């Protein structure tokens, strides 16, 4: 989502500003500004980059991970995003001036909406209604493989296909009647794996960093992690085969037989 949004911003060829709302711990400081006290000058107000952004004519402002933002950030954005209001009150400033959003300013936001996403909040419907919603489905195998080759041209087509196939298998598995895993490999993780492959790591090594930590190892040979090792094993070369411990090897042999 973020990558697509950034490509959109680049294509528009207009002044652009990026704000990761999911990462900020200080919504007021990020969107309005902060007051500072100096003995010589007294209390001063430093407006935020966001204030500059909304005053920039024809700017495109990307609000990334808005579904992870603090509710206070949503409250601040309500009037800014409302087509009938389009203003921001700097209530941290001693004079509390009102800043109007400049002509032609466009806001683009990204969000993960749904119970399967952790660390997100149920978004206020009034905030959601201020946007035109574009739903993005998961890439299919061919699309994901093509994306990996585009972003990391140093990997082989076979490597790109293998990573895309592993990701696709996890997405199908969690939708099955009796899924053996509780989450799937995202496109973001696929891209990270491809980056490691391009840097010279093999698939087994990349999986240790990018895949297995996201899958529970409780349950021994019946664990999610063992299942994922079995999936990855199918796409590892002979030099990468030793990815199981002794118990997992026995389980793998039983599965193969």
Named regions from a protein language model:
Residues 140-257:
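Alpha-helical lid/collar subdomain of P-loop NTPases
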């Amino acid at each position: 989502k973020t990558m697509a949004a950034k490509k959109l911003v680049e294509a528009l060829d207009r002044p652009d500003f990026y704000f990761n709302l999911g990462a900020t711990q200080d919504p007021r400081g990020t969107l309005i500004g902060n007051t500072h006290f100096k003995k010589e000058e007294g209390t001063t107000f430093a407006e935020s980059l966001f204030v500059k952004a909304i005053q920039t004519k024809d700017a495109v402002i990307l609000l990334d991970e808005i579904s992870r933002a603090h509710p206070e950030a949503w409250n601040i954005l309500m009037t800014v995003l409302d087509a009938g209001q389009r203003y921001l009150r700097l209530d941290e400033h001693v004079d509390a001036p009102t800043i109007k959003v400049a002509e032609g300013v466009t806001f683009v936001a990204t969000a993960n909406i749904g119970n399967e996403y952790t660390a997100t909040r149920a978004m206020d419907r009034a905030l959601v209604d201020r946007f035109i919603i574009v739903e993005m489905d998961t890439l299919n195998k061919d699309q994901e493989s093509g994306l990996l080759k585009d972003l990391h041209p140093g990997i082989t087509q076979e490597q790109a296909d293998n990573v895309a196939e592993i990701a696709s298998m996890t997405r199908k598995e969690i939708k099955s009647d009796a899924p053996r895993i509780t989450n799937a490999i995202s496109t973001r993780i696929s891209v990270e794996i491809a980056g490691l492959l391009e840097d010279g790591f093999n698939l087994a090594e990349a999986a240790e960093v990018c895949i297995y930590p996201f899958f529970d190892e409780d349950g021994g040979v019946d664990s999610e992690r063992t299942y994922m090792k079995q999936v990855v094993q199918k796409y590892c070369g002979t030099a990468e085969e030793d990815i199981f411990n002794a118990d997992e090897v026995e389980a793998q042999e039983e599965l193969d037989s």
